[in-house]
Amino acid sequence: MDFKEELTKWREERSITLESQLPGLTSNLLEEVTELSRATELVDVIDAMLDYNVFLANAIEGIDIDPVLDPEIVKEIEEKHKKLSVMTNEDLALYKKSLISLLLEGIRASIAITMPNIKQEHIDSFTEYLNGIIINIKSSITLLNYDYAKCLEEVMKAIHTRKGYWDSTISKFVKDKTQPDRYEPDYTNCKL
């Protein structure tokens, strides 16, 4: 599945552009960090990280939502995975704090990108930084023994079933909370 193409299709079906989402990006990212901080289950942590990535890719040109991991990173993940056989509640709490710190750094970069009159060279630099965060998130999800691409497919299924409307006052697609047939991502089949 071409995730970038899927997001483009989603935006086109709703007459939403990258540019129209940029003003609300910081608020949307903060919402995902809040969800991450409140998550009590590992799948909720994964869901918040994936939604964070989707918001970035849906608002900023040049974001690679499914980057290829460097072989050295993959090797490092495999080594760490050997040590991380079972995650306790204490481990999850510590892990979440580390991720929250990382995602907040991404929010700082997204704020800079939304500044008026920012030079293209600075946008490129911040976009590269945000792509590094996405690599970190993909690595983290893989380390947690989940297939990142399959998880993203679940997110895409959910996105495509959503009904709602674009609210230009908050620069966000507002989901219809009463929609009975809304698909919720099921990450149980995404385990490695």
What are the functions of these language-model segments?
Residues M1-L192:
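Flexible "arm" and connector segments at domain edges
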